[in-house]
Amino acid sequence: MFQTAWRQEPVTFEDVAVYFTQNEWASLDSVQRALYREVMLENYANVASLAFPFTTPVLVSQLEQGELPWGLDPWEPMGREALRGICPGDEARTEKEGLTPKDHVFKETESFRLMVGELPGNVSQHLDFGSSLEQPQGHWIIKTKSKRRHFTDTSARHHEAYAVKNGEKFEKLGKNISVSTQLTTNQTNPSGQISYECGQRGRYFIRMADFHRHQKCHTGEKSFECKECGKDFRYNSLLIRHQIIHTGKKPFKCKECGKGLSSDTALIQHQRIHTGEKPYECKECGKAFSSSSVFLQHQRFHTGEKLYECNECWKTFSCSSSFTVHQRMHTGEKPYECKECGKRLSSNTALTQHQRIHTGEKPFECKECGKAFNQKITLIQHQRVHTGEKPYERKVCGKTFSWCGRFILHQKLHTQKTPVQA
C-alpha cells in the first residue's frame, strides 16, 4: 500500500477564517451575520486554546466590538496581502479553473461551513478521505479545491467532518461508523443526507452540537459564565478575555505612557488617546468617538432606544454594562476586590478608579493649567473653571452651576420645609 509522509503544521486562525467584502456582507441577513460572528469567534477561541503565541486578529477584534467585519477587499492587491485569506497558488488556480474572484470566495465559504459542521450542497466533492492511503491514527484530512490541510486530533477537534454514503453510513478516513450507534438524526435534507434542520431558517447541520449552537443565534442565549463575578458571555473568546481582569494581569503596554492593559483591543483604543484618532462619527450630530461601543451607546441617545429595564425600579438603560452595574445596587453584589486594602466594588471601572488612590496615578491632565486628576469626570468639571461653562440651571431662581453636586445641594435649599411657628 502506498505510504505518505505527513508534515505537522500549526493551525492558525487564517486557516479557518472567512472574509467578506462590503458588498458581500450587505447581502447577508441578520441571522446569517449572527451565525458568522458566532462561528468565527468560537473558532478563534479554539485556535487560541492551542497556546500558539499570536496577537488577536483584526477580524476577531471587529466582531467582538460589534464593528462591521469588512475592510480591505481581499481581491485587491493590498487587501489580499493584508488579509492573507487566500493560500499561495490560489490566484493561478482560480484563473485556470475559470472562476471569478467571488466564485472563489463562496467556494471557500462553503468549505468553511463543512468544517464547522454545516452541510453544503454536496459533501463528497469537498472531502478527500484518502481510502488508498495508509493514514496515521487520529489524523484527519480536509481537502477543498483551494487548499489541503492536515490536522491531529489535539489541534483540530473543531474541524471534525463526516460524509454521508448512501444515506446509511458516515465515513471518516475510511472507517465506517453506523448512523444508529454514532449519530441520532431527526431530518433528511433535500439531497437525501441525514442531518439536523433548523425550523426557522431551513438550514441543515451534520452534528447536534452545531445545530444547538446555531439555535442560540435565534434565542440570544449566553452560555459562558465567569465564575468570579457571574457575568455571562455569548462567546467563549470573550469570557477568556474577561477573565484576565480578575487576574490583574496587564500584558499589553502602551509605548507612549507605559500604561498596561489587559487586551490588545484595549491597547488599540487607549492609543487613540495619544493619537487623537476618532474613527466613529455620528451622522446625526457630527460628534466623533474613538471607541465603537461608546459610539453605539451615543446613537441610542438620538433614537431614544433603551434595551434594558430593571425589574426592581423600572429604570431603563441603553447600555448592557450600565444595566448590570445598576442591578448590583439592588443585590448589593460587589464582585471586584482591591488587593491593596480589600475593599470590594460593584464594577471594574470603580475598581480601576479606586486603585489610583493607592498608586497615586493621575492620568487626566488639564491642558490649560497642567493640573492632573485621577478621574475623567473630575477633569471635565475642572475645565469649566477655565471655560466658564455652567450647564446646571435652577429654573425657579435662574441660578447656574458648573458642578452637578453643588446644583443638587442648592435644590435642597429650595425644597427644604420651613418649620411651622407655634
UniProtKB/Swiss-Prot annotation:
Superkingdom as given in the UniProt entry: Eukaryota
Domain KRAB: 11-82
GO terms for MF: DNA binding; zinc ion binding
InterPro entries from the UniProt entry: KRAB, KRAB_dom_sf, Znf_C2H2-type, Znf_C2H2_sf, Znf_C2H2_type
Any Gene Ontology CC annotation: nucleus
Database matches in SMART domains: KRAB, ZnF_C2H2
Keywords, comma-separated and alphabetical: DNA-binding, Metal-binding, Nucleus, Repeat, Transcription, Transcription regulation, Zinc, Zinc-finger
Main location group: nucleus
Cell location: Nucleus
GO biological process, one term: regulation of DNA-templated transcription
Signal peptide: none
Zinc finger (C2H2-type): 196-218, 224-246, 252-274, 280-302, 308-330, 336-358, 364-386, 392-414
Classification via Pfam families: KRAB (PF01352), zf-C2H2 (PF00096), zf-H2C2_2 (PF13465)
Cystine connections: none
PANTHER family: RIKEN CDNA 6720489N17 GENE-RELATED (PTHR23234:SF10), ZNF44 PROTEIN (PTHR23234)
Function recorded in the entry: May be involved in transcriptional regulation.
Protein known as: Zinc finger protein 620
Name of the gene this protein is made from: ZNF620
